[in-house]
């Protein structure tokens, strides 16, 4: 087995047309040793734990401030306008950065994403703010 030299960051972002989309970015793991590859140290503005019950589903909304979301338990589905969705399982993450463009009024038919708990297990997430 070889070492990973990059970490794939899944990003939920607001595109130029106002719609939320997913993209992937690579973060170099250029520090540390071959046995323990590290990224640079990221600044953070705190963290928050959340649990969501079986059956939870939000309405369309935008992220208030960019933050990482790590799935600790259960499964979380993120849905976008147009029917695209993605399910995240324990150990997976996404970087939520689909903020409302400055000067724009929120339109639930255009902006944001919805989230929901999937399956029979409680959803447990960790949010880490920039």
Pin down the residues of each PLM region:
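A short glycine-rich, His/Asp/Glu-containing loop-to-beta-strand
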Residues: 16-60, 66, 121-125
